[in-house]
UniProtKB/Swiss-Prot annotation:
Similarity field: Belongs to the CCR4/nocturin family.
Protein name (Swiss-Prot/TrEMBL): Probable CCR4-Not complex 3'-5'-exoribonuclease subunit Ccr4
Functional description taken from the UniProt entry: Acts as a catalytic component of the CCR4-NOT core complex, which in the nucleus seems to be a general transcription factor, and in the cytoplasm the major mRNA deadenylase involved in mRNA turnover. Ccr4 has 3'-5' RNase activity with a strong preference for polyadenylated substrates and also low exonuclease activity towards single-stranded DNA.
PANTHER family membership: CARBON CATABOLITE REPRESSOR PROTEIN 4, POLY(A)-SPECIFIC RIBONUCLEASE
GO CC annotation terms, alphabetical: cytoplasm; nucleus
Gene name in the database record: CCR4
Keywords, in A-Z order: Activator, Cytoplasm, Exonuclease, Hydrolase, Leucine-rich repeat, Magnesium, Metal-binding, Nuclease, Nucleus, Repeat, Repressor, RNA-binding, Transcription, Transcription regulation
Species whose genome carries this gene: Enterocytozoon bieneusi (strain H348)
PROSITE patterns: LRR
Length: 481
């Protein structure tokens, strides 16, 4: 009778919990089973369940993604569910004084853990000898290969019938994650972020899709010069150009060049006729419109993003194509700078479109912008409202901006949920935009959402970057009159 009363009170207490409850202490309550009600309290940051009679941690514990402190010490737990590794915000985890024998490798993904205790458990070798410090977590992280095999990413037709009389050209964009940034990813195994390992997987990806024009971002300059340029020339008949991006050293505050954006093309299909390199910082501070606008000069300081525009003529049909490769600034606190960079870039493309009257346009890259952003809306809708730069003085731009290009998103209407996936971010921020006289006939399929439920972020054993490759195939008619 006493047990039933406790269970009744326990369920009643949970049912009456505030949806925004952040902490729950249920220690010393004689609890044997964790009810589903607890796993629905998604706002919890602390869950204390020590000194009970709990035997099983439910898989649904992974719902509590905001948890920072989790205490299961002094219970009767025999097994740690792999789903526990999805609680990536955990800073404290206490599993000591249970009956745990093994530790799942997925626990290594808990990269924010500061305090971890699993002492006084009958752990088998080698877990037991590593239980006193974080070496157990490192061991799990380094040996975690338990990733579900993703579905093959194949070409998906976007039209019912393809005109066989027209030439087809494939385009793609891929932020491949430079080694400088990869080395800071504490949630990934060292062998996953190792440059040599990632180079091999990246090469396999390039070869598998064999794109006619490939735009890359965050390409290590040294690796481009010593590896990619030569290897891709040999294996895919590519030629390529790189535009280095300056990065400021945090110690010396001096600019250095670690990585850049690259455009590769098939030498047997395209002839390069012009190249335009844009340093957004230099372009903006030297623009007469912004000469006396201190807000712009302050906001743009040390924002060293670049854009690379290459103009090609097709070898068989003499069609002109403007390929614009870009990597916009990342910080969401500087959305005004992203918009300004976009305005400047589209102005340059407009100028080239006037020069090459019948040219087609493919604009692709890492825009660091969501589909509901002003950057995306400006590209698609061709205009900006008058208040987007408030409270800063952007001169005439505060009155609204327009452009004349008609561009579409190649993945519009298709079920793509992300192009960038990390433990703290999962969204579409990379795009392929194309002009209206290009016929989109197929795209590379997205990664299925089911796969992302088994991992906390990229890169991993299957994907070498925190971004994914996206690609599209187009047909277009000759630009000759």
């Amino acid at each position: 009778m006493e047990e039933k009363i406790k269970k009744k009170d326990y369920n009643k207490d949970i049912d009456n919990c505030d949806d925004e409850l952040e902490g729950l202490d249920m220690s010393f309550q004689g609890i044997k089973v964790i009810g589903k009600e607890i796993t629905l309290l998604v706002s919890l940051k602390q869950l204390i369940l020590n000194n009970n009679d709990i035997e099983t941690i439910p898989e649904d514990i992974s719902n509590l993604i905001r948890l920072e402190v989790l205490d299961f010490s002094y219970n009767k737990i025999e097994k740690i569910p792999t789903e526990l590794g999805r609680l990536i915000n955990l800073k404290e985890l206490y599993l000591n004084n249970n009956m745990i024998v093994e530790v799942p490798m997925e626990l290594g993904t808990l990269y924010k853990l500061e305090n971890f205790s699993i002492l006084n458990n009958p752990l088998v070798h080698p877990y037991g000898i590593m239980s006193k410090d974080k070496s157990l977590l490192r061991f799990c992280r380094e040996n975690n290969t338990n990733y579900k095999q993703p579905n093959d990413r194949v070409w998906i037709d976007t039209v019912l019938k393809i005109d066989q009389s027209l030439e087809t050209y494939s385009f793609g964009t891929f932020n491949i994650l430079c080694s400088l940034y990869a080395s800071n990813l504490t949630y990934a195994p060292s062998w996953v972020i190792n440059l040599e390992c990632r180079k091999d997987i990246l090469m396999q990806t390039f070869i598998a899709y064999n794109l006619d024009i490939l735009c890359l971002q965050e390409v290590d300059i040294n690796v481009f010069n010593t590896f990619y340029k030569e290897q891709l020339a040999q294996k895919l008949d590519y030629d390529g150009v790189i535009l280095p991006k300056k990065s400021f050293d945090k110690v010396t505050d001096q600019p250095k060049k670690f990585h850049g954006i690259v455009t590769f093309w098939k030498k047997n299909k395209f002839k390069l006729i012009e190249q335009v390199s844009i340093d957004f910082f230099q372009k903006i501070i030297n623009d007469k419109r912004f000469k006396y606008l201190s807000d712009i000069h302050t906001r743009i300081f040390q924002k060293t993003n670049v854009g690379l525009i290459t103009i090609f003529e097709t070898c068989n049909t003499n069609i002109i194509i403007i390929v614009a490769n870009v990597h916009l600034y990342w910080n969401p606190e500087f959305n005004d700078i992203k918009i300004l960079q976009t305005i400047i870039y589209l102005e340059e493309i407009e100028f080239l479109k006037e020069k090459y009257k019948h040219a087609h346009i493919v604009l692709q890259g890492d825009f660091n912008s969501l589909q509901n952003s002003h950057v995306y809306q400006y590209i698609i809708n061709r205009k900006l409202p008058t208040n987007i730069f408030d409270p800063w003085d952007y001169g005439s731009l505060n009155n609204g901006v327009t452009h004349s290009l008609t561009l579409r998103n190649a993945y519009d209407g298709h079920d793509i949920t992300f192009t960038n996936f990390t433990p703290s971010f999962k969204a579409v921020i990379d795009y392929i935009f194309y002009s209206k006289y290009l016929n989109l006939i197929s795209i590379i399929s997205p990664i299925e959402d089911e796969y992302t439920k088994t991992t906390i972020g990229l890169p991993n054993i299957h994907f070498p970057s925190d971004h994914i490759l996206i690609g599209a195939k187009f047909q277009f008619k000759s630009s000759k009159k």
